[in-house]
Amino acid sequence: MWDNILGHSAQKQFLQKYLYADKRPHALLFCGIGGLGKRMLALEFAKTLLCKSHTGNDDCESCRLLRNINHPDLILVEREEDEKKRFKDINIAQIRELINQSAFAPVMSKTKVCIINDADKMVVQAANAFLKLLEEPPAGWVIILIADSVDKILPTILSRIVQLKFYPIENSLVEQIVRKQGVENERAAALARISEGSVGTAVRLYRGDGLKADLFTYREQALMFLQSVPLEQPLNYLSRQLWTDKNFLHREAVVTVQLLQLLLRDLLMCKLQLYDKIYNVDILDILRNQSQRWHIASLKKALGIVQETYTALVNNVGVKAAMEAMTIKIDLLYKE
């Protein structure tokens, strides 16, 4: 069952038993890092739960409606976007609307399924209102919360739900999926390692979702910088560098810095001859050659500089200022 979702066999077994249990919890929490397929499995589980035959094989009207997220017995609560396409936290109005819907009985099934995606991104007022719903759950409801972490979920909510933890899947499975997207073998292996077992992350990085280019374009920029150090004329270099251009987006800068951090880490692994720990396996020969130009102490300091830059960007320091400062600091470090 749910063979279209790779991995997570233990979680699937739990949900299969849930389908036929006489007594079952009314609320579940799917918890684990982003990109593991938690939302996809929640929807597949809801489809099976609402299906008359409990097969979810798309043969009935219920399955077809749910596949299009148009089922009268499915409530899907998700974060909304603001005018700048940034996701906002789940607000009190969304939870109040959910509470209003709890007054209505299921239409096509004996069950109504409510899925709250990014449940760890609720504002406090929304979380408190949702807690009241959990304390007196509507008859026939199955509530599924989806979260990357439990740290920001109220303890009083956690005490009333059953947690189902999701873990990163094997790199070989991630490789298998991204190859189907048309990625060549060596790059698929690199994507699997960089995404650390998160299929969603691997696919987004390959497609460049929300960015102007894909992962490998930004990695090439970061690698070219490391290959250019020491800079003969830093100011001239900066004037030509894409990441100090005024049109370079904040999210592009964040991705570039993260990739630069991985490259520096890989150079350090090469110095230590820990080749099985390398993320960017598709450019291993290049990394080996580049590592010969660096001292271990310098690589560790450079990693610190890049981490400082990432923190600055997360705290909304200007992209141009942050990237220029990082470039100059790493160049000076290499010249010491």
Where are these regions (language model features)?
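A short beta-strand-to-loop transition that corresponds to the Sensor-1 phosphate-sensing loop
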Residues: 117-118, 145-150
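A short, hydrophobic/aromatic-rich structural module that often spans a beta strand
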Residues: 123-132, 313-321
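Clamp-loader machinery-focused feature within the broader ASCE/P-loop NTPase space
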Residues: 1-125, 291
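Conserved catalytic/switch belt of AAA+ P-loop NTPases
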Residues: 128-145
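Conserved adenine-binding aromatic site and its adjacent loop/helix in ATP-hydrolyzing domains
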Residues: 100, 132, 155, 159
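Charged, glycine-rich active-site and insertion segments that engage polyanionic ligands
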Residues: 1-48, 65, 139-141, 149-259, ...
